[in-house]
Design a protein with these regions (language model features):
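Protein kinase glycine-rich loop
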Residues: 35-41
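ATP phosphate-binding glycine-rich loop
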Residues: 44-50
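ATP-binding glycine-rich loop module of kinase domains
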Residues: 52-100
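Structural motif at the C-terminus of the N-lobe alphaC helix and the adjacent alphaC-beta4 loop
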Residues: 98-109
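Activation-segment/catalytic-loop signature of the eukaryotic protein kinase fold
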Residues: 116-117
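Conserved short submotifs of the Hanks-type protein kinase catalytic core
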Residues: 121-135, 139
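Activation segment signature within eukaryotic-like protein kinase domains
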Residues: 155-156
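Catalytic-loop of the protein kinase fold
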Residues: 163, 167-180
């Protein structure tokens, strides 16, 4: 019996005859190439990506709730765990609604613009601009001295403005942390 092969980036099952994951490096919506996985949380997976028409970098957020999702098959379809089908579908719709709401208010100062939201592979993807940069925690760790209050305020003001824009339309971020 041959051991099951798993993609080290998205943890999807690989067929024995393929050498490249059909999901990572694959093209979504006919326009976005999925790159390396950057992070994973309870809501889903964040990938680097490329928009293939204008050839610019993007960030792709995939709805994949770990507590509700079964293993992704070789067909790249995301399946809910047995008994979690209704909650999976409901939260998938919530994910799509959230990113479509953010798309309507961006580009608000301090928020990455949501460029596209679409369904494919029995999941939802949100494509966002990728302005580059490094996470705040990494920037702080690499500094030789503490940050002044004025520098911190100036640097974080766009974040405050973005959160305020979200609150004005009834959205709550729930994911702000120095690692982002």
């Amino acid at each position: 019996m041959e051991a099951k092969r798993i993609c080290p980036y998205c943890m999807g099952e690989l067929e024995s005859r393929v050498s490249v994951c059909p999901h990572c490096g694959g093209v979504l919506a006919g326009r976005y190439t999925v790159g390396e996985m950057q992070s994973i949380d309870g809501e889903g997976i964040l990938y680097r990506g490329v928009e293939n028409v204008g050839r610019f970098r993007v960030t792709i957020k995939e709805y994949m709730p770990l507590t509700l999702s079964a293993e992704r098959g070789t067909d790249a379809l995301l399946r809910p765990k047995l008994g979690s089908e209704v909650l999976f579908k409901t939260t998938r719709m919530d994910f799509a609604d959230l990113y479509r709401s953010i798309q309507r208010i961006t580009p608000a100062n301090g928020l990455e613009a949501v460029l596209d939201v679409f369904e494919e592979n029995n999941t939802v993807y949100a494509v966002m601009e990728n302005p580059g940069g490094i996470p705040l925690q990494q920037w702080l760790d690499e500094r030789p001295s503490p940050v002044s209050a004025e520098t911190a305020r100036n640097m974080l003001q766009p974040v405050f403005d973005g959160v305020a824009a979200m609150h004005q339309v009834g959205l709550v971020h729930r994911g702000i942390c120095p690692e982002n």
